[in-house]
Amino acid sequence: MKEIDKYAGKNILVLGLGRSGFAVSKLLLKLGARLTLNDKADLAADPKAKQLADLGVRVIGGSHPVDLFDQEKFDYLVKNPGIPYENPMVAKASEKGVPIITEPEVALSASESPYVCVTGSNGKTTTVMLTQQIMDHYLQKQGHHAHAVGNIGCPISEVVLNQAGPDDLLVVEMSSFQLMGVTDIEPKVAAIVDIYNNVHLDYHKTFDNYVDAKLNVGRFQKASDYFLANFDQKDILAREEKATKAKILTFSENDPVADFYIGQDYLMHGEEKMMKIADIKLPGIHNLQNSLVAIGISSLMGAGKDDIAAVLSTFTGAEHRLQYVTTLDGVKVYNDSKSTNIEAATVAIQSFKQPEVLLAGGLDRGFVFDSLVDLFKKHVKAIVTYGETRYLLADAARKAGIKTIVVVDNLHEGVKAASKLAEAGDVLLFSPACASWDQFKTFEERGEYFVKYVKELEEK
């Protein structure tokens, strides 16, 4: 941890006692701040709340007391990224002119390790995992490590406080929720894997707001830093060029004009062959793009082709992201629970040459699924739909001419139905194309239940 004066003696309100709220509170205490922690949940029996209280934090649970802002002056409000800006405490802080920031900004300002940041609508977690493993392979030769932190599930504050040294590297996954609250971060390399519409518009309200939040990943970089941009998304690229002072390098699915691109047999950096495509374990063109971005970041940070090959030739996928689960009677089963939108489902469905039995459905966020019709025609032999969107997805399947359509209420029924439809040589793909919140708390929980239900079938 780097000693900084920015938060020393400051009166700070931390909003939300999740894992990141707990971690950033401990970090801020170490940096000399005076803390109040507030959560709408009852914290009377919460062990984390008790631990913070024992360390001198004023803990207020069970409500959002907006009158706190009338009683005293706060220097900062550090909010859980998932809490909307319409929250009464956040709105009151804004009204009072209190700077509103999130955990990543606090943690990265105190990091003595250099860091790189990755964001995007789809693919950022896989890209972060690949980058972390490549860089760890490289740094271990020197006795140091790369740490995957941020939206991937490990708060940056935890690693900054307890693990990372000056010669380590933080590989940070950042969501648009986290980036919206950022006012000053400077990654050595920033990357935006892709940006699609219809993602988190319930939070950001407009697509422009969503893009602006994503652009914060490179907005505060210097000319000596690097920014990796998607050459194939020209409208976004034009905005990226205006948003960052860093040197922009591009990557492309197939255009050799880009700095990094997918060639016929190799992932390329200019004329240099970086990795043989046939040796990459991850399925799908989108994972070749994720691999390309990881190669770009890692090579800029010093890793060599031996480090890249060691990881890409063995890495089989992140949990819930086209995760291979098992083979049931000749049917390969994949868990793509992270597919919370149409774009993510599209890349998953396109990833296989075998006939697919698709299991999809979830929360109805107003998506129109007609864009999947042509994809269904080419790849899907049968479909099982469940959840709030079950009839909407079934309607898209009918338009595609799919003859076998099964509509069920929940995921458990869906797994059983899909397994009966799949034959040896098929792929059973769980790629919901929807958020999980109609029946599950998170996409991770949904994916865990999918795997559990599949394993139950395997044991019969």
From Swiss-Prot:
CC terms in the record's Gene Ontology section: cytoplasm
GO biological process, one term: regulation of cell shape
Keyword check for Signal: no
HAMAP family registered for this protein in UniProt: MurD
Reaction(s) catalysed by this chain's protein: UDP-N-acetyl-alpha-D-muramoyl-L-alanine + D-glutamate + ATP = UDP-N-acetyl-alpha-D-muramoyl-L-alanyl-D-glutamate + ADP + phosphate + H(+)
EC number of the protein: 6.3.2.9
Keywords, sorted A to Z: ATP-binding, Cell cycle, Cell division, Cell shape, Cell wall biogenesis/degradation, Cytoplasm, Ligase, Nucleotide-binding, Peptidoglycan synthesis
Residues annotated for ATP binding in this entry: G120, S121, N122, G123, K124, T125, T126
An example molecular function term from Gene Ontology annotations: ATP binding
Domain of life: Bacteria
Protein name as annotated: UDP-N-acetylmuramoylalanine--D-glutamate ligase
InterPro entries per the UniProt record, alphabetical: Mur-like_cat_sf, Mur_ligase_C, Mur_ligase_C_dom_sf, Mur_ligase_cen, MurD
Biological or metabolic pathway of the protein: Cell wall biogenesis; peptidoglycan biosynthesis
Function recorded in the entry: Cell wall formation. Catalyzes the addition of glutamate to the nucleotide precursor UDP-N-acetylmuramoyl-L-alanine (UMA).
Family affiliation: Belongs to the MurCDEF family.
UniProt-listed PANTHER family: UDP-N-ACETYLMURAMOYLALANINE--D-GLUTAMATE LIGASE
Enzyme class: ligase
Organism the protein comes from: Lactobacillus delbrueckii subsp. bulgaricus (strain ATCC 11842 / DSM 20081 / BCRC 10696 / JCM 1002 / NBRC 13953 / NCIMB 11778 / NCTC 12712 / WDCM 00102 / Lb 14)
Record flagged with keyword Cell division: yes
Gene3D superfamilies noted in UniProt: Mur ligase, C-terminal domain, Mur-like, catalytic domain, NAD(P)-binding Rossmann-like Domain
Locations listed in the record: Cytoplasm
